[in-house]
From Swiss-Prot:
Species in which this protein is naturally found: Synechococcus sp. (strain CC9605)
Source organism phylogeny: Bacteria, Bacillati, Cyanobacteriota, Cyanophyceae, Synechococcales
Superkingdom to which the source organism belongs: Bacteria
UniProt xrefs under PANTHER family: S-ADENOSYLMETHIONINE:TRNA RIBOSYLTRANSFERASE-ISOMERASE (PTHR30307:SF0)
EC number(s) from the headed UniProt entry: 2.4.99.17
Gene encoding the protein: queA
Protein name: S-adenosylmethionine:tRNA ribosyltransferase-isomerase
Family per similarity comment: Belongs to the QueA family.
Length: 366
């Protein structure tokens, strides 16, 4: 019988000392600490501890790493309203003909018809067109040639800032590189797929030399990253959709995999499983929105193992990881990580969930 607490949001809360929230990345990337989840039935105190570099020992020839190659836009803009007040826009997604959905702060002071000037630039003006009730954001007119992520990226690189999460209290020029994965390629995200931040060029080369294969999906991390789960009854949970691209090459790599399919980060899980669910549980190429909810009781169709960071309390990402190893085990491991001074969230340390420690009843069918 499933535990009813697994479907209550309050069951995914945990106390986190503020000093455990990482404010800066470690160098080199692969020197972040790595908590290796022990097998089911063994206490959390039996978890092994090392560094991300130890994936060279944990992964095997023939394994397939699936990474997210999205690139974070410099999507945070300081703007001045026509009255002179300073506001902020977070550029989220295109809505056609140079119109973009943005989060505004302070939102109440940004009204339809307002003319905005990008702070530090006198030549670029924006117009607030309308409020967006679904997101609480604003529809903003940019220059008409800013049609999509590729065409707006040049403008944002000149005048924007990296949109670090609100719990990171720093502004450092190095974030423009450090808050990107080494394989970031396709612009469109407003937050990084943070498990991928741990991979250095040296680690990637070592894995390739060992015979570990790499496949790239794209999931543009969007607005939902900043929105907490507010539904106590998780049977009624609905999540934001995010745009994904699972190419024919990725599907072929999964089908040809001689070892284990390992997702790097929860975004890779969501993309692979979302593509499979769109085709009745069978992985096929897919491009489009995914709003899949993964929580305890979910039966995985593709993913066998996971490298992931430590996630916020009561978040959808915590639900996803719990689906692999169980809620109680995950929270015990988080307690162990806090006791051992692990660093949490985007710039923090990582957890390795090998396929052999995943709950047997949720593993993909042969």
């Amino acid at each position: 019988m499933p535990d009813p607490r697994d479907l209550q949001l309050s069951s995914y809360d945990y106390p986190l000392p503020p000093e455990r929230i990482a404010q800066a990345p470690v160098e080199p990337r692969h020197s972040a600490r790595l908590l290796m989840v022990p097998p089911q039935g063994e206490p959390s105190t039996d978890a092994a501890h090392g560094q991300v570099w130890d994936l060279l020992e944990q992964l095997q020839p023939g394994d397939l790493l699936v990474v997210n190659d999205t690139r974070v836009l410099k999507a945070r803009l300081a703007v001045r309203r026509s009255g002179g007040g300073l506001s902020e826009l977070l550029v989220l997604e295109p809505r056609g003909e140079g119109r973009w959905l943005c989060l505004a702060r302070p939102a109440k002071r940004m009204r339809p018809g307002d003319i905005l000037t990008i702070d530090g630039s006198t030549s670029i003006s924006l117009t607030v067109l309308a409020e967006d009730p679904a997101s609480g954001g604003r529809l903003v007119q940019f220059p008409s040639d800013c049609r999509d992520a590729e065409t707006i990226e040049g403008l944002l690189n000149d005048v924007g800032e990296v949109p670090l999460p609100p719990y990171i209290e720093r502004h450092d020029p190095s974030d423009s590189q450090r808050y990107q994965t080494r394989y970031a390629d396709r612009p469109g995200a407003v937050a990084a797929p943070t498990a991928g931040l741990h991979f250095s060029d040296e680690l990637l080369a070592g894995l390739q030399q060992k015979g570990v294969d790499l496949a790239r999906i794209t999931l543009h991390v969007g607005l939902g990253t900043f929105r907490p789960v507010e539904t106590e009854d998780l049977t009624a949970l609905e999540l934001h959709s995010e745009w994904v691209d699972v190419s024919p090459a990725v599907v072929e790599a999964v089908q040809a995999c001689r070892g284990r399919v390992i997702a790097v980060g929860t975004t890779s899980v969501r993309a692979l499983e979302g593509a499979a669910q769109a085709h009745g549980g069978v992985l096929k190429p897919y491009t489009g929105p995914v709003d899949l909810v993964i929580q305890p009781g979910y039966r995985f169709a593709v993913v066998q193992g996971l490298l992931t960071n430590f996630h916020l309390p009561k978040s959808s990402l915590l639900l996803l990881v719990s689906a692999l190893i169980g809620r109680e085990k995950l929270l015990e491991l988080y307690h162990e990580a806090i006791e051992r001074d692990y660093r949490f969230f985007s710039y923090g340390d990582a957890m390795w969930i090998a396929p052999e420690v995943v709950l047997p009843e949720v593993q993909p069918r042969p």
